[in-house]
Amino acid sequence: MSKNTARVFEEVCRHARRTAVMASIHEFLGWDERTMLPPGGAEHRAEQSTLLAGMIHQRWVDDKFGEQLDGLAADSADNDVSDAAVIVRRLKRQRDKRVKLPQSLVEELSRTAVMGQQAWQEARNGDDFAMFQRLLERTLELKRQQAD
């Protein structure tokens, strides 16, 4: 690996690590929402989750990050099993999936997940599926869009 390639690889890894830290914070907010969020806190948590999901998505679809990954992928053969080549292939595969999703969909999925979780808890406690049905249908609609 040339010095320039090593430098680019380190930049890509640094970018991916920071993105992973942001994703773990997002997951922590999700855990907290499912276990500790007080009633009435869902709207604010949905805003937090939506903002963070959008920021994470922006990092994944960042043009410079994509160009660096493409360059690194072009430098390594498909059968290269070095740690660096495997990392690049996995990051590129993850990025390729994410660039297909519009940011608005990513944000709406995040928001709907939070609101749906809270609606489900209330519906379960009140034995009233209708309280949850609208958000469940919206979630399914968004997941279908994501799958397309």
What is the meaning of each model-derived region?
Residues 2-148:
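A well-structured
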